[in-house]
Amino acid sequence: MTKLVSKIFKRLISQSQYMSSSTTSNLPAASQTSNLESQLLSSAPPPAKKKRGSALLWYLVGFTTYGLGETYKFLQTQVEHLDSRKQCLEMKPMKLNTTKDLDGLGFRRVVCKGIFDEQRSIYVGPKPRSMSKSSEIGFYVITPLLPIPNEPNSMKSPILVNRGWVPSDWKENSLESLGTGGLVAAAKESRKANKLLSSQQSLLSKFWYKLNNPMIVEDQVSRAMHVEVVGVVRKSETPGIYTLVNYPSSLAWFYLDVPKLALAMGFGEDTMYIESTYTDMDESRTYPVPRDVENLTRSKDIPLDYHLYTVLWHWSSLTCFIKASSILMRRLTKSDPIGVEPILIPISILVFICTKIYSLRNLFCKIDTIGVGCVTKLDTGKVK
């Protein structure tokens, strides 16, 4: 009997030990499953807010790059200016005897007859001149053209003429011929002219000033030759950031300031300024070198990189729009967009951009807007 009871107790003890061991072995598996569930939850993508925000960001970048691409095509607005300049410059030069109604001339060439007063010439610069292999530093020589007495085809009032580009030796020789006394006298005359013209408020002073101009011309007729100048009416230059300030008292002129130049020569501030031009350059003529007519239309070609920049920015914009659209389509359809239509859209837009750029290939150039005189938009039918 005792043996039977002992056997029963042993079986109960062994069963309890087995149950405890099985429960302890199941604990790591439960912990592993909980870890896997937490990893899956953490790796699951947050829904729509992130995708919607990324799509808006791509759209913003797309609009920005498209705007940058359009800035390189802004010069197409200058087509009318280019056409009007070409038409005006191709016309036959007209005789200009008066300084009235200059705004109606545009870029039409004019012919002015008079006498050069080379003693009052002023050199503006330095101005570089591009050669075939290098560049040379020189100056623009500005000389007053005085009226011819008793000549009906002559100018009625003095004008300033930019005769063209000359080497630096011309200015050095001019200063040497003047000498120290000449420089002081020229500075005094400049200051005297400024004081005289600034005080021209009354009718008597204006009459006295106009009365003195013909006397100067008559004294110089015997030692001057009659000349005809063909050029374009221009205005003052806009100085750059690094351009030095003009010092009329020291005869130092770094940019074209027409009113100040006229005052320094003893004329009024409203004196007309003409830039001499040529169509066929005479090779036997050395200096001054007038400005080529073609340079009045286009002064400097823009590099080919601008075309590449336009294609680059528009292509970047197109890529951003496609990326943003694909994100929205995935959000709405919950599947990747496939098929032929998404491929045809970027190809068609790319073809449109390329054809647009090719049509504007002749307009990628800098328009000469510095020193432009009068009106550039001109109805040639109204020009007489």
From Swiss-Prot:
The keyword Membrane applies. The chain crosses the membrane at residues 55-75, 302-322, 338-358. Keywords: Membrane, Mitochondrion, Mitochondrion inner membrane, Transmembrane, Transmembrane helix. It comes from the Eukaryota. It is a multi-pass membrane protein. GO terms for biological process: seedling development. GO terms for cellular component: mitochondrial inner membrane; mitochondrion. Its main location: mitochondrion. It is found in: Mitochondrion inner membrane. InterPro entries: Surf1/Shy1, Surf1/Surf4. Belongs to the SURF1 (TC 3.D.4.8) family. May be involved in the biogenesis of the COX complex. This is Surfeit locus protein 1-like. The lineage of its organism: Eukaryota, Viridiplantae, Streptophyta, Embryophyta, Tracheophyta.
